[in-house]
From Swiss-Prot:
InterPro entries: CD36_fam
A GO molecular-function descriptor: scavenger receptor activity
Disulfides per UniProt: C245-C310, C274-C330, C312-C319
Extracellular-side positions: 127-436
Function as written in the Swiss-Prot or TrEMBL entry: Plays an olfactory role that is not restricted to pheromone sensitivity.
Membrane association type: Multi-pass membrane protein
UniProt-annotated location(s): Cell membrane
This protein's encoding gene: snmp1
Protein family: Belongs to the CD36 family.
Transmembrane segments: 106-126, 437-457
Glycosylation sites recorded in the entry for this protein: N193, N206, N418
UniProt KW keywords: Cell membrane, Disulfide bond, Glycoprotein, Membrane, Olfaction, Receptor, Sensory transduction, Transmembrane, Transmembrane helix
Segments on the Cytoplasmic face: 1-105, 458-540
Protein name (record): Sensory neuron membrane protein 1
Length: 540
């Protein structure tokens, strides 16, 4: 925090940033509570084209299907201001609306085959963490799947994403009832009727509460603007083996403090992945003709970064591969997060799956950011979710699965400000800065001219009566040389050749050349002095 910066300071009422605070009535507060435009939310799914081969331990082959385009609306409600702590408390709601017009030719009715998120997810986690329960869970899974014959799910795309896949929990057998009860308590399924549940990727989250947040408003310290204080009444997480990994670092990603520099990271904390991610400065950029800063994200390599060992299951031996993050502690399922198509990740991950084609343009994470105002003008947050698959030991159906990280889908959440918003940024910030700069230089120029003119006027007033003694030659003619070119106006010498009184007016060129010394010159002319023309030339 640079609270000692004279530009930033701690004055909450400083005019240059009072509209950026999350104080009631400010423009920023209204936009923070409800973004006035939807974010673009795109989903890409990976269809496994050879599930039978994979069930026998073969190499998976996938084909990407997408994008399925959604509007994502973010709204914060039930807001409470705490003046003493300078915090804002709110509940977040995310709403996704399918846009078939922007998804064409895709409709959501396409059939897709993927590793079964529910079956494999549950069995793999039990095998990893609670192996003693494997017989009970395996028996219950066989009953509700009636019976279990494969580790893959073939279903309609929109059922998988939002509408839901039916899970039969009508059996009264103990293992089946225990399994269904566990799935419900974990929030993996939602009730459909008395005997069935529904499972989907996003259905449970659509239009529902996404947690109770507390963030700083930035009134007392603008550099704290938007910083997460607590989530669901917890001031830190409790899922990693290390305090640093459990901290909330940064904002909720919809707002950032102003006056950042290229040395700062853009930090944001996300409950969807239970960790903070920091984007680093990547260079200068332009957006809509405006100068910007370009920030990029790197997931790093936890194995070779001791400060990130708290994200490892058993460091340094069991850590997520380079360019990935282990989401199992957060999601309760063997899910690995990465950039799409394993871009910027361990090459071994890409080699283990056919059909992936990573490239920077489509798969990197970026932000075009205006540092002074803290405004992201164009951004794409991209994350791929893959399942960490391995053989289920002693299982007749799932015992031959390969050990592989198999992509399920990836999501892109982004927005690019249109002309309405970039023009507002241009006229309120950039042109404002240019106007301020122009005013500053205009003030300097006018001040300089004023000094010169003022000096000239003072010079003129104080030199109205100067006694001049012309230097005569032996024959009575005026002296030539340096003094010959000097203009003297007033009375002519008297008949006795004595002195006369005449004002001396310097040229504009002389004034400009000597403007810095005008106060000294003027001081020397407080009263009339008897000087010769030659002396005046030498003096001025």
């Amino acid at each position: 925090m640079r609270t000692d910066d004279p530009v930033i300071g701690n004055d909450g009422d400083a005019p240059r940033y009072k509209n950026l605070m999350l104080k009631p009535g400010t423009q920023m507060r209204g936009m923070f509570e409800k973004i006035p435009f939807p974010l673009d939310f795109k989903l890409y799914l990976f269809h496994v084209t050879n599930p039978d081969v994979v069930m026998k331990g073969g190499k998976p082959r996938v084909r990407e299907i997408g994008p399925y385009f959604f509007e994502e609306w973010k709204e914060k409600y039930d807001t409470v201001d705490n003046e003493e702590d300078d915090t804002l408390t709110f509940t977040l709601k995310n709403t996704w609306i399918f846009r078939p017009d922007l998804s064409k030719p895709l409709t959501g009715d396409e059939m897709i085959t993927i590793p079964h998120p529910l079956i494999l997810g549950a069995l793999l986690m039990v095998q990893r963490d609670r192996e003693a329960m494997m017989p009970l869970v395996s028996k219950g899974m066989d009953i509700i799947m009636n019976p279990l014959t494969t580790g893959f799910l073939t279903t309609r795309v929109m059922d998988l994403l939002f509408d839901g896949i039916l899970i039969d929990c009508s059996s009264h057998e103990f293992s089946a009832k225990a399994l269904c009860s566990g799935l419900e308590s974990e929030g993996a399924v939602m009730p459909f009727n008395e005997t069935h549940f529904k499972f989907s990727m996003f259905g449970l989250k659509n239009g529902t509460d996404a947690g109770r947040w507390v963030v700083y408003r930035g009134v007392k310290n603008i550099m704290d603007l938007g910083r997460v204080v607590s989530f669901n009444d917890e001031t830190e997480m409790d899922i990693y083996d290390g305090d640093e990994c459990n901290r909330y670092i940064g904002t909720d990603s919809t707002i950032f403090p102003p006056f950042l520099t290229t040395k700062d990271k853009l930090w944001a904390w996300s409950p969807e992945i239970c960790r903070s991610i920091g984007a680093e400065y990547g260079g200068k950029s332009k957006y809509a003709g405006l100068p910007m800063s370009f920030f990029k994200l790197d997931f790093g390599d936890a194995r070779n970064e001791p400060e990130h060992h708290c994200f490892c299951r058993d460091p340094p031996d069991i850590c997520p591969p380079k360019g990935t993050i282990d989401l199992a502690p957060c999601l309760g399922a063997p899910i690995i997060g990465s950039k799409p198509h394993f871009y910027d990740s361990d090459p071994k991950l890409l080699a283990a799956v056919d059909g992936l084609t990573p490239n920077e343009k489509d798969h990197d994470v970026y932000i075009h950011f205006q540092l002074l105002s803290g405004t992201p003008v164009s951004a794409a947050k991209r994350l791929m979710f893959s399942m960490e698959i391995e053989p289920i030991r002693d299982h007749a159906v799932l015992g031959n699965l390969p050990t592989v990280i198999l992509p399920l889908f990836w999501a892109e959440e982004g927005a690019s400000l249109n002309k309405t918003w970039t023009n507002q940024l241009k006229y309120t910030l950039f042109l404002g800065l240019r106007f301020n700069t122009a005013v500053k230089w205009l003030t300097i120029i006018i001040g300089t001219i004023g000094t010169i003119v003022g000096g000239f006027m003072h010079y003129k007033r104080t030199t109205k009566m100067v006694n001049v003694t012309p230097v005569q030659s032996v024959n009575g003619s005026s002296a030539k040389g340096k003094g010959a070119g000097m203009t003297v106006v007033g009375h002519q010498p008297d008949s006795k050749g004595g002195s006369v009184t005449a004002p001396v007016i310097p040229s504009a060129k002389d004034l400009l050349q000597n403007s810095r010394n005008l106060p000294t010159v003027i001081e020397g002319l407080d009263k009339p002095q008897k000087v010769t023309v030659t002396e005046m030339q030498e003096r001025y």
